[in-house]
């Protein structure tokens, strides 16, 4: 039976031949012959879209790398940092539905360009608080004169017998605190970071649904998956540079250019260190503004490829979409009125929600992104707290090792889809298999943790024994009972016995000296209390480093983390192609918009918040602001942090795997149903038995994938 590709597509959906003049999805698109000179502009659009993906991904990666810096600079808990991180998704939520639906019928490149401008200004707004806040003030021994290299010996411990009147000291201290409280207007400056990130979300809204749909509309079916894979790979390269930029800025002091760095007594390894977090946002904002330029020069539509021109729709869609071919104006039609476009909004939404494959994939992706958003947001903090690494090093290894593995995985997924021409079922199997294997590997990370740092009164007793029962007076002991110490300060000192003390005062140190930036404390009674035979009762400012075994565990963690990242990302492009192929072409942008909306609202906003709230429960020592309110966490329980962080990620990943299995089950069921319905309907057609015999072979050939009009995939 000789039919055109259009008629063959109609045969699968209407079970009858379609007249040659019937409507198809090519309505409104310029023909290949008409717009031949514009063919090269698809590559220009591909390059422009890749660059804007790079710019937005760089800013997102940089934001993740500055989570701990922002937490310390503004003295806020992890839960509030999670809300700031989620403001990007809130901005997306405000306009995503309308942008994805109406934007698909307007000038898509210009809408993307306008979004880039908003995104650029929002990114720069995040850096604004640095120029209006007071200089960063960390907890330090203020009696030391930073202008001198050697400081006379003073006693951190105010002995009862020799200290001046405590009332006079406390009076001066209270006056200072009261004055600082009046002038402390910087405590709410984090709101600008929230608003800037929200603007970033508003500006980013049109990029994914309109950009990917535009690319898929005008690329050949053979190249669509490859092009999308290229864009997604470039998008992963962005965070590499974002984390590397974050690593560089974390080494620079927050007030660089505003203070004399010779007077700074802490180093990047100190838990109170805050890097130049604001600097990277200025760079990322400029790149976003630059990315807007090419989109203002691109046309509203491009010529469709010859394969799309001939086929009109893909065979893969025909097996899973009920009645996909009906007349609707395509994105190329000009001057559609808003009311005309809005008329089909609810019917289109209803059509999407009646698609079981789309809904199940939406649920699976949402749960999986909850896992991924929470994991990525707090990964730098996890590396810092679990393995004792600096913020700069944590960002460096994520940017240089983890993210390239993700990029390679996404690119490999696109190559596999193109080379083996996988159908929807095979793509779903690859997506499911990568998730299962990836989360199984992730389980091994539970065994790669480190012991808690030995901190007197928090993780070990003052005698150095474990465990310690924490209570309100746990930081005080007989060895520091004669000292007038505050238990709210965090001025860590590493004793020669390998135990960290919350402050030199709580270590019972009676004398000290300074040479350059190094402060040596001596005659520390609590150090001798834990190691009475050593005879060396001294210590140095700063936390004690974790043992060498922890460094070895960190290397194993990196290896498993890289393999897991590659495995999970391998299913990214197959999953994306499943999303594009299970819906009607004219609803593609709208479906991508709803998908993005669901991921933003149900994963991007809540995941960092509830991850942060649960992580805060593992805090052992909170810092305090000038006015006495609670600030950011200074020390976490490593065991509790590990179980919360890894356990929650694994739990969500497991749920997403079961939902992905349901997607595959429904796909297979719909294919068998469509296949059987087609054969039954054909057998009812009034034909003579001789004609049936004559056309049987041709019909069987027609059911084989290579005879379907959209030959880009095979089941």
Curated annotation (Swiss-Prot):
Glycosylated residues (UniProt): 452, 523, 536
Transmembrane residue ranges: 44-63, 83-103, 110-134, 188-216, 236-256, 275-299, 352-373, 394-417, 422-445, 558-580, 590-615, 650-667
Disulfide bridge positions per record: 479-509, 485-505, 494-526
Alphabetized InterPro entries for the sequence: Kazal_dom, Kazal_dom_sf, MFS_dom, MFS_trans_sf, OATP
Record topological domains on the Extracellular side: 64-82, 135-187, 257-274, 374-393, 446-557, 616-649
Topological type in the membrane: Multi-pass membrane protein
Tissue specificity: Widely expressed throughout the brain except in the cerebellum. Not detected in kidney, heart, lung, skeletal muscle, spleen, liver, nor testis. Highly expressed in cerebral microvessels throughout the brain and in the choroid plexus (at mRNA and protein level).
MF GO annotations: organic anion transmembrane transporter activity; thyroid hormone transmembrane transporter activity
Cellular-component GO terms for this entry: basolateral plasma membrane
Record domain Kazal-like: where: 473-528
Pfam families to which the protein is assigned, alphabetical: Kazal_2, OATP
GO biological process: lipid transport; monoatomic ion transport; positive regulation of thyroid hormone generation
Reaction catalysis annotation: 3,3',5'-triiodo-L-thyronine(out) = 3,3',5'-triiodo-L-thyronine(in); L-thyroxine(out) = L-thyroxine(in); L-thyroxine sulfate(out) = L-thyroxine sulfate(in); 17beta-estradiol 17-O-(beta-D-glucuronate)(out) = 17beta-estradiol 17-O-(beta-D-glucuronate)(in)
Alphabetical list of Gene3D superfamilies matching this protein: MFS general substrate transporter like domains
Recorded superkingdom: Eukaryota
Cytoplasmic side: 1-43, 104-109, 217-235, 300-351, 418-421, 581-589, 668-715
Annotated compartments: Cell membrane
Listed SUPFAM superfamilies: Kazal-type serine protease inhibitors (SSF100895), MFS general substrate transporter (SSF103473)
Key words, A-Z: Cell membrane, Disulfide bond, Glycoprotein, Ion transport, Lipid transport, Membrane, Transmembrane, Transmembrane helix, Transport
Purpose: Mediates the Na(+)-independent high affinity transport of thyroid hormones at the plasma membrane of brain capillary endothelial cells. The transport activity of substrates L-thyroxine (T4) and 3,3',5'-triiodo-L-thyronine (reverse T3, rT3) is much greater than that of 3,3',5-triiodo-L-thyronine (T3). The prehormone, T4, is the major form in the circulating blood and is converted to the active form, T3, by the iodothyronine-deiodinase in peripheral organs. T3 plays an essential role in brain development via binding to specific nuclear receptors (thyroid hormone receptor).
UniProt record similarity statement: Belongs to the organo anion transporter (TC 2.A.60) family.
Protein name: Solute carrier organic anion transporter family member 1C1
